[in-house]
Amino acid sequence: MSSTILGTIGQTPLISLARLNRPEEAQVLFKYERYNPGGSIKDRAALYLVETAEQRGWLKPGGTLIESSSGNFGISLAMIGAAKGYRVLILVDPKTTEANLALIQGFGAEVIVVTEQDDSGSYHKTRIALANKLAREIEGAYRPDQCFNRLNQEAHYRSTAREILEQCPGELSAFVAAVSTGGQLGGISRFLKTYAPQAQICGVDAVGSTIFGGQANAYRTPGVGLSWTPLNLTLSNLDYAYKISDEHAFVAARAFARHEGILMGPSSGACALVALKLAQQWGPERRIVSMVSDGGDRYIGTLFNDEWMRSQGFSTTASLEDVREIARELKPWSESPGECANEQMGLTETLDVPQATLLANAELHVHDMIRARRSPAAAFLD
C-alpha cells in the first residue's frame, strides 16, 4: 500500500509489440511512462526536484512551486503540490493544449499565460525569465527549473535508467528517447554509457528545433525542442541524432494506437519510428528500448482529431505498413551528435537562473567527480 499517490511514481512497464515486431528483426520494447500517476515520465523528475529542495531547505511547508511548462512537467508539479500542500504556479503559453490546462488547474494549480515570444519565435525564454522573476518576488517560492537544473537528469540516472536495465535482461542494443529539457535523455544516456556501453543511444528531436543545430522553424510536435542545447544533455553521450517531421511523428502515434492498442503522444511516435528503423537494420538477437513518455489522451483535440490533422495538412490514415516505410526511409541528422551542440553562452545570466539551481548544479558536479573515482560496481549502488 502507498501512503500517498506519490508512492506510485516509477516502476513503469516495459512492453513488447504484438504486431509490429517481426521474427527476422530486432525486438522493439516500449518503456511506457503513462502509468505514472500524473500520466507521464515528468513525475519522476518533478518529485525528485521537490524532495531534494525539501531536504536542502529550499522549499518549506506552505511554500510555492513556480515553473515554466507547457505540459507534462506542469501537470506533475500540480499533482505533487496538491499531495504535499504547496501552492503551485505554472507559466504556460498559447500553444498549451486545453487538455493540459484543464489537468494543471484540476489539481488546483494557478496558471499564467505568457504571450510574448522570445528571439527564436518560441516562448521558452520569456516563460523562463518571468518564472525566475516571480520566484524572486514571491516569499517562500522555489523554482524546480527543469531546463537548467541538473537534478532533472540525475532523477533519471537514479531511477528510469536502472529500471530499464533491470527489466531488460540480456543485451540492450539501443535506447531511443526524445529531447527537450534533456533530463530523461541526459540522465539515462549517462547511466547506460557506464553500465551498458554496448547500447547505441539515439536522441530524437523535431524538424525546426535547434538542439542539434540547424535552421530554426516552427514545429507542432509537443514534448521536444528548444532553441539551444540544454545543460542537462551531454551530446557526446549520444551515438545518433534524428530529426522527425511533425506529420511523421503524428501519423506514427496514431498508428500505434490503432494497431497496437498503445496510446502515446507525437514525440513518442517519433521515437518509435527511430526504434523501428534500427530494428529493420538488425537481426532478432538485438533489443531496442524506446521511451513512451506519456499517453495520447492528452492530445485528443489534435493528434486524434481528424479535422485538426487535415487542417495541418497531415494524413489521417495510419497503417503499420505506412509506418514501416516511413521508418525505412529515415536517415540520421547526425552520426556525431557531440559536434552539433548549439550552446548559447550566458543564458544562465541572461535568464537570471535561480540560486538554488546553481547550488544544486555545483553540488552535483562535486558528486559526479567523486562517483567517477569509484568503481562502476560501487557507483551503481550509490
Report the location of each language-model feature:
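PLP-dependent amino-acid enzyme catalytic core
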Residues: 1-382
